């Protein structure tokens, strides 16, 4: 079992055997590379030396790794059998051995060797005598070939420095697909030399040049990461239609959208000029991205503009296309032919495969196991389906011979707790914890198949399971800025990376959180701003450098989960994303540890643990007066004051009930009712933030005090 010995590694390797033969680090540490390797390995080995120097404070003579094989005294010997190619099913396996005399990394390709270097950096430990690599033998390879992260550009543009530090973090946790979401209703974000009007009119001034795109691809390739572009078609196309309104299905004035949601503007799929335009544009974009896969979107087409266009309706009747889904399939096939000429395989959201039907009919087919009834059978098999709406799309894809990747349950922009993502497995048999998302209606119905999965039954055959090639976390940027995006990405995405890399039996949530706290700090060392920006933003919010008392509140609240912020409909592209909700971190470590304390107290209400609880409650009680004074002249602290008030009230009442228990007295029914009412009131969100700890606090206090 990979988790039999406790390590700090994330993701957990396939096989780990620790030993006490630690390798002591000195200034003389050097690296030797042998075998066949691309230049990327030499660059990454040099970067490894720099990071190791920064981590240990050691003064190495050089960070550069010469492209020569002679260096018999090298401490780290890396051997690569072949030069790797960054593509689907790239060879990423490696073995790593550390003893007191040397370190060896042997890999099938230089990409595997790079994965081994990341593991080795996580083995650095220290004691009073200095730094060392933990003695170990590791054999490792990924469980899934597709381990991705989507980053959308049109909503809030993320500049080059954000992309590069995101790629650095992805490489650290062994993710290997960067999904570059280029276009939507809010913008088209790369330069077009064949249609310069596109980036001139439809980017809002925010776009990457061809040179910058090449820089991103090279940066990713060095780290063993594929870059896959997405141009969302035929819906989500307001930006394209702003530049080229003659391609639209409906005559109207088109301007870039600055709100969030699903809109009607749709490309006209019935006119040949559309395909002339898309042939030229997609061929240009395809030439920029060397990966064999190209994402065409295909999601959330309302069909409204098609329904209103008499010419489109006449075309559908002539071609025997019964509905908007059939027309979109016609469009997709035309796009597929265009991209095939560029040697591309299309990827699309699950709408490109699934039939449109009411929930009752879908439930009937799903419960009967007639999954072929859920899909459009005329869709070519050589596509990849990205499942975002529910497990039925994933199952139907695999059952009918389509490759698929899972994103449902990996929407990190919805700020769900880390365990929610961690326990969400791409293989349905293992997806025993299927968490319905009531905001998104991802699970549209309960069924016997869902119950079978939750009971651990296999729904797919081994061959069908192989068609599920991985998963992809999605970072939709409606409610983030370059300043806040890291706090939404990290460290939670590291847990998704582990789910996609590590063996299926690695599911210990407590141990995941233990290691996540460690990896979080290491991600900051690498350049992630998820920790330091939170403090900077809180200082700005408070207009002072003294933020300790504010942190005592902010560290225990969370942004509202799911689509609650989207549904408020008062945020746009130009709204401030520097408010309390933007400062608050998803699944904060302090809140988790407080809840863990309460869980432990229910089992073992020892004096030591009770004292810890008292200290925290006293802190919130006494903290409030200071915050009240700070908020008096600062309206930006209004929502924080609301949460501080809740904490002060429930803390003081909790102390009262605990003191009664200490005196051997019982709380009256009226006191219990008042306490419950206060807890309930504290759960009401303020400033799009929620204070959820009251539920666990109430559970312990009432359980303990009524015994």
Regions found by a protein language model. Give the residues of each.
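Active-site neighborhood of glycoside hydrolase catalytic domains
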Residues: 263-384, 388-396
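Active-site-proximal loop/turn and secondary-structure-junction residues that shape catalytic pockets
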Residues: 184-186, 194, 231-237, 300-302, ...
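Conserved alpha/beta catalytic core and glycan-binding cleft of carbohydrate-active enzymes
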Residues: 354-357, 364-381, 386-529, 602-608, ...
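Contiguous, structured surface segment used for ligand recognition
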Residues: 4-144, 496-509, 514-527
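C-terminal functional modules
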Residues: 89-94, 469-487, 491-707
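Feature activates predominantly on carbohydrate-active enzymes
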Residues: 83-295, 309, 334, 338, ...
């Amino acid at each position: 079992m990979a988790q039999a010995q406790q390590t700090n590694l994330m993701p957990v390797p396939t096989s780990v055997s620790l030993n006490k033969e630690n390798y002591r680090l000195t200034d003389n540490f050097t690296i030797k590379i042998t075998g066949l390797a691309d230049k990327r390995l030499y660059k990454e080995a040099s970067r490894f030396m720099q990071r190791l120097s920064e981590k240990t404070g050691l003064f190495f003579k050089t960070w550069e790794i010469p492209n020569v094989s002679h260096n018999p005294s090298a401490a780290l010997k890396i051997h690569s059998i072949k030069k790797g190619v960054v593509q689907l099913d790239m060879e990423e396996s490696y073995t790593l051995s550390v003893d007191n005399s040397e370190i060896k990394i042997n890999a099938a390709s230089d990409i595997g060797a790079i994965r081994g270097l990341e593991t080795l950096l996580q083995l650095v430990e220290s004691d009073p005598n200095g730094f060392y690599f933990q003695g170990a033998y590791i054999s490792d390879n990924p469980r899934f070939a597709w381990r991705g992260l989507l980053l959308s550009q049109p909503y809030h543009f993320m500049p080059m420095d954000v992309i590069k530090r995101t790629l650095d973090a992805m490489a650290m946790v062994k993710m290997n697909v960067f999904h570059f979401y280029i276009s939507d209703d809010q913008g088209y974000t790369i330069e077009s030399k064949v249609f310069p009007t596109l980036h001139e009119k439809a980017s809002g001034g925010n776009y990457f040049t061809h040179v910058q795109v090449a820089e991103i691809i090279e940066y990713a390739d060095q780290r063993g990461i594929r870059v896959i572009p997405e141009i969302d078609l035929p819906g989500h196309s307001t930006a394209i239609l702003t530049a080229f309104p003659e391609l639209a299905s409906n005559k109207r004035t088109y301007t870039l959208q600055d709100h969030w949601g699903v809109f009607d503007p749709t490309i006209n799929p019935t006119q040949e000029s559309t395909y002339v335009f898309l042939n030229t544009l997609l061929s240009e974009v395809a030439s920029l991205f060397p990966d064999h896969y190209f994402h065409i979107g295909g999601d959330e087409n309302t069909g409204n503009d098609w329904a209103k266009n008499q010419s489109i309706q006449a075309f559908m009747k002539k071609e025997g296309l019964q509905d908007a889904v059939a027309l979109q399939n016609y469009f997709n096939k035309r796009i597929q032919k265009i991209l095939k000429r560029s040697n591309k395989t299309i990827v699309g959201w699950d709408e490109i495969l699934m039939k449109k039907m009411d929930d009752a009919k879908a439930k009937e087919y799903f419960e009967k196991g007639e999954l072929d009834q859920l899909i459009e059978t005329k869709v070519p098999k050589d596509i990849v389906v990205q499942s975002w709406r529910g497990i039925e799309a994933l199952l139907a894809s695999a059952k009918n011979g389509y490759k698929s990747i899972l994103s449902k349950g990996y929407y990190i922009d919805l700020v769900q707790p880390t365990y929610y993502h961690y326990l969400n497995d791409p293989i349905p048999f293992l997806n025993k914890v299927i968490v319905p998302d009531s905001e998104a209606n991802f699970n549209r119905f309960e069924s016997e198949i869902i119950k079978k999965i939750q009971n651990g039954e296999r729904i797919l055959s081994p061959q069908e399971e192989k068609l599920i090639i991985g998963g992809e976390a999605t970072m939709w940027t409606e409610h983030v800025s370059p300043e806040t995006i890291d706090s939404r990405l990290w460290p939670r995405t590291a847990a998704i990376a582990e789910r996609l890399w590590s063996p299926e039996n690695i599911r210990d949530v407590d141990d995941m959180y233990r290691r996540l706290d460690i990896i979080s700090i290491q991600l900051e060392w690498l350049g992630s701003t998820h920790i330091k920006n939170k403090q900077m933003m809180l200082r700005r919010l408070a207009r002072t450098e003294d933020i300790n008392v504010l942190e005592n509140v902010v560290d225990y609240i969370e942004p509202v989960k799911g689509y609650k912020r989207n549904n408020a409909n008062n945020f746009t592209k130009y709204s401030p994303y520097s408010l309390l909700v933007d400062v608050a971190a998803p699944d904060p470590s302090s809140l988790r540890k407080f809840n863990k304390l309460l869980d432990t107290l229910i089992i073992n209400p020892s004096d030591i643990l009770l004292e810890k609880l008292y200290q925290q409650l006293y802190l919130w009680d006494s903290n409030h007066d200071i915050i009240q004074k700070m908020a008096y002249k600062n309206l930006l602290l209004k929502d924080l004051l609301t949460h501080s008030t809740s904490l002060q009230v429930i803390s003081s009442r909790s102390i009262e009930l605990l003191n009664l228990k200490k005196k051997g007295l019982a709380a009256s029914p009226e006191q219990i009712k008042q306490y419950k009412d206060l807890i309930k009131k504290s759960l009401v969100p303020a400033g799009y933030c929620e204070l959820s700890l009251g539920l666990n606090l109430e559970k312990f206090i009432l359980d303990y005090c009524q015994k």
